[in-house]
Structures are given as C-alpha cells and as structure tokens.
Amino acid sequence: MTSPLLFQPLTLRGLTVRNRAWLPPMCQYAVDSQDGIPSTWHLIHYGSFAVGGFGLIVAEATAVSPEGRISPCDTGLWNDAQVAAWRTITDAVHELGGTIAVQLGHAGRKASTEKWWPGFHGGVVPPEKGGWIPVGPTAAPADGKQYAGSPVTALNEDGISKIIDDFRTAASRAVVAGFDAVEIHSAHGYLLHQFYSPLSNTRTDGWGSDYDGRVRLPLAVADAVRGAIPCLLYTSPSPRDATL
C-alpha cells in the first residue's frame, strides 16, 4: 500500500527530507544568557521534534547580528561559539533521522523588545537595560503601542552594506553549524519586509522610492546568501502588511 503523500520523501536541491510534515520556525526567546548561544533547552526542544518524526525542522528566527535580534533572548549566528552550540543540535537531529534548516533574520525597527512570552507587557528594552537602538529603512518606529516613541536609526549606505554582509556571513556559519538548508526571514514586519513594503519604506534614494528600490535589499541579501552556501535556500515573504 502506498503511503499518503504527506509521509513520502521529498528531494529539493539534493536534500532528501523523510516526509512533508515540516516544523515551521517559532521564536523561543529562551537564551537567558542573552549572548545568542542556544542551550541544552534548545537541544531538547529540537531533538524532541526529530524523535517525533518531523521531516524538516526549521529552527527559530536566528539573528545575523546582535542588533538584529527581536529580543535580547534570541539565538544568533554571528560568532563561533554560537556555531559550536548549534552544531551539537544539528548533529542530534541528524542522528535521529531528521533534517534541519535555520531561519536567518534581522528584526530591524522591531528589534530590542521584551521576550514575547506569557505575561509580556510590551515595550522596547532600552540600552541601559541590555537593549539597543533599532535600525530601519527610515527613523519611523514600527506600528503598535509597544513601539510608540522608541528611537530608530535610519540605515545609511554603510549600514545597508553591513546588513548584506551579516546575512552572508551568518549563512556561511550556518553551513559550518551543520544546517541542511537556510531560510531568509522576509516577513512579519521585520527588516527585509520593512524595506519592500511601501508603508514602511518611504525612502527617496536607490533603496526605496519605487518597487525596484524597495526590493533591492531583499534581492541583494538573497544573492549574497546564495553565493555563500551550496545548500537549499528559500525565503518567507509576507502576503500582507498588517504586521509592520
């Protein structure tokens, strides 16, 4: 008897996944050390889904730089210590028969918030409490009362170049960390979404002003990441702007 399509293997760019039941990326806000390094908690979390039989496990939104984190308690891939910790997790998932991708992202103007756990009261974490000044396509804060009045730095040419380099470097680190695929986070009102949406990107230079300008950064990031890794690459754009 043929198994249902859901439980049949799927091969994409040379990566064979054991079935089509995939775990989507879900932010955990569980790095209490606030250094971006995943812990034993993450090992158990992702390992349990591999034991449960998921095909591709997509690790949570992982920042390409410290200032790209949604909260100070997010994971990252900007240094070697993070690579080593992730490698322990990817090795475990592979030993359990699973495959694992990582969602690389930058929160942009929605960065430096409290962790979104039960009891979250909203608000941006200020620099004096371990936060930082977020960046965005303009100096306008994100929508929502938790962001009201919080300062944002508009990215200049050097800042945009750094964003592209950060994605490229993080993707290279993802390969060393043992990830089988990379997802570029382009949704949910985070930085790349902020650039391609006309609601948040009101720039008048070559990184805005019209459609081609607004999609320039997401495409540049995709090109940089594609050139840095040999494995499967995909992205997650947003179909609506309600999360900006």
Question: Which stretches of residues belong to each language-model region?
Answer:
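N-terminal capping/small domains of soluble enzymes
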Residues: 2-105, 114
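Active-site beta-loop-alpha junctions enriched in small/polar residues
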Residues: 26-28, 105-107, 187-189, 240
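Active-site mouth loops of central-metabolism enzymes
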Residues: 28-40, 75-77, 149-165, 240
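Structural preference for long, well-ordered alpha-helical segments within the folded cores
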Residues: 48, 92, 166-173, 181, ...
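Alpha-helix-loop-beta-strand connector modules within alpha/beta enzyme cores
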Residues: 79-96, 202-233
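Non-globular sequence segments
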Residues: 105-177
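Polysaccharide-binding and catalytic clefts of secreted carbohydrate-active enzymes
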Residues: 154-155, 162, 183-219
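Single conserved hydrophobic/aromatic residue that forms the stacking wall/gate
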Residues: 234-237, 241-244
